[in-house]
Amino acid sequence: MNFEGKLIGKDLKVAIVVSRFNDFITGRLLEGAKDTLIRHDVNEDNIDVAFVPGAFEIPLVAKKLASSGNYDAIITLGCVIRGATSHYDYVCNEVAKGVSKVNDQTNVPVIFGILTTESIEQAVERAGTKAGNKGAEAAVSAIEMANLLKSIKA
């Protein structure tokens, strides 16, 4: 038997956790995610958005939302840009581990839509210019994974 998630958003309930830090980037990721969800027939009333201060806070809120049982998928959006210190490495590693842990603990797909870039230019490229919009890509993954898990449960 093959299992495959369909890209049909009808009847899905999705939460998006988005960092306010680097909001000139994360705002564009959020727009891309919401637009893509709606284009795939997710009802706008079934999209909830939680804003957090920075990327480090994303896993905690994602876990709270996933544990509520109210959502078919959680999308995480943030932007961490390398600076002059090692802070970037710590934040990126811990956020990735945290999001992965939420997937394991809740069995709700939590999609990693957090940009980890070397420069502002790379972030801008991935937020809707040259390299597409990673928020939109995360939304497609959320729809597919939510439907895949539903098909396995059936």
Swiss-Prot record:
Its EC number is 2.5.1.78. It catalyses: (2S)-2-hydroxy-3-oxobutyl phosphate + 5-amino-6-(D-ribitylamino)uracil = 6,7-dimethyl-8-(1-D-ribityl)lumazine + phosphate + 2 H2O + H(+). (2S)-2-hydroxy-3-oxobutyl phosphate binds at A84, T85, R126. 5-amino-6-(D-ribitylamino)uracil binds at F21, A55, F56, E57, C79, V80, I81, F112. The active site is at H87 (proton donor). Pathway: Cofactor biosynthesis; riboflavin biosynthesis; riboflavin from 2-hydroxy-3-oxobutyl phosphate and 5-amino-6-(D-ribitylamino)uracil: step 1/2. The keyword Transferase applies. Keywords: Riboflavin biosynthesis, Transferase. SUPFAM superfamilies: Lumazine synthase. The keyword Transferase applies. GO terms for cellular component: cytosol; riboflavin synthase complex. GO terms for biological process: riboflavin biosynthetic process. It comes from the Bacteria. It is an enzyme of class 2 (transferase). InterPro entries: LS, LS/RS, LS/RS_sf. One of its GO terms (molecular function) is 6,7-dimethyl-8-ribityllumazine synthase activity. It holds the Pfam family DMRL_synthase. Belongs to the DMRL synthase family. Catalyzes the formation of 6,7-dimethyl-8-ribityllumazine by condensation of 5-amino-6-(D-ribitylamino)uracil with 3,4-dihydroxy-2-butanone 4-phosphate. This is the penultimate step in the biosynthesis of riboflavin. Forms an icosahedral capsid composed of 60 subunits, arranged as a dodecamer of pentamers. This is 6,7-dimethyl-8-ribityllumazine synthase. It comes from Staphylococcus aureus (strain JH9).
